[in-house]
């Protein structure tokens, strides 16, 4: 009966965090709008080989992530949940692997359930796992690969070892098809310390080639198809998206070596109090094979991405699966022997909640700021934000009431965040970061437009997805579409600022022409170097400028 209650609680937890509130949050640009539109175009065109964005070739990532996103929109429709369905599914599958692997290591159902709940409630996992990017997919394949390798190395027969390594190759191949060759580097780096300490080189060299073969066979069909359709894909993807992004001096998202330290700290909430003890206990028990494996899985990718010049928080998502298992194991030990770390965790959550309450007041209309984040008419959003942090502090306090029994309720600290964050976003943020909000406000003007031009790729993708059209034209800036715009068949999909007046004269009689521009809050629209318009509609950071036929 207790197991049934735990399962019901887990399903309720998943529903409240990962299912019910997802549709209440508008899509963020540039990431969510980009991936939503790529998948919409894939469904509309039926082309499941070459990814396109705004009808242009888009070679920043391989195809597998777009497949999953497209299936999500196919099943649930072109809506907020449909766009995010793929990443939620991948996150829940990763949690299922955490459950399975924890059971495999410790044969403890309670520990397995706890590891799963910790993983799903970690701030970084929840933030990325409900956000339509490709990282939850690659995290799933990496976690699946680590589970497959362990399965292979623990097998006692050649058939079991062979099956494990073949499965490892398939997961690595799918990882390559999701986000590239990092799906090969990360698992190799993660397992090497364990292989070295356990002296398991023989099995690795005897059976490792099976993983190589299955990986190649997994990638080969699509790899050959894309090479035949677009011969430049692999050159661009390998050189620009791998070498330049991670290693060269002009790498994207450059950050210092210590960048991931605050990411780990913030990402570990609401379980931050367990982080030092989990890592220390893991190191202290390093003679235990499974603990070494989890430590290596956690630390090696962190070191690898810390050395790389290009860094983003999403890159280390897979590390938190192993960290959740270490935390769960340590938490049960602490509850049994010395609950000090659990008390500290409760106080950290209380402190975080109260800090958020104070910060919300400071940036509210009633705070000391001359330009508050929320305006007076958005009072309900301020109260939603207060509720988020109040619930965080409340559950932090509740874990202290009988810490040996109630400490696990820290998993409910982010409950307010999950349910209310979509209702607390300030209008000034929505107007710049949520193109759907802009489309709602300007639908009647946008819908009949013959041509729509914009200077932001993220806004362009949002307009295209909301209006169900892929012919948005880039104005003044090419952004990440620069490569696709270089192809001869993309002629006419970009208009520079100097060319706009002539372009307008040539096309004005064909129908309504709409410019959607991103501007600074204090920027004077009249100072824009554009021909006089027939209509202007400013929505804070986004401006709709319209030209009608004469």
UniProtKB/Swiss-Prot annotation:
EC number: 2.4.2.43
Membrane topology note: Multi-pass membrane protein
Catalytic activity: 4-amino-4-deoxy-alpha-L-arabinopyranosyl di-trans,octa-cis-undecaprenyl phosphate + lipid IVA = lipid IIA + di-trans,octa-cis-undecaprenyl phosphate
Upper classification of the organism: Bacteria, Pseudomonadati, Pseudomonadota, Gammaproteobacteria, Enterobacterales
Full protein name: Undecaprenyl phosphate-alpha-4-amino-4-deoxy-L-arabinose arabinosyl transferase
Transmembrane segments: 7-27, 81-101, 111-133, 137-154, 165-185, 204-224, 255-275, 288-308, 315-335, 346-366, 382-402, 406-426
Principal location: membrane
One function term, GO molecular function aspect: 4-amino-4-deoxy-L-arabinose transferase activity
Pfam families: PMT
Location of the protein in the cell: Cell inner membrane
GO biological process, one term: lipopolysaccharide biosynthetic process
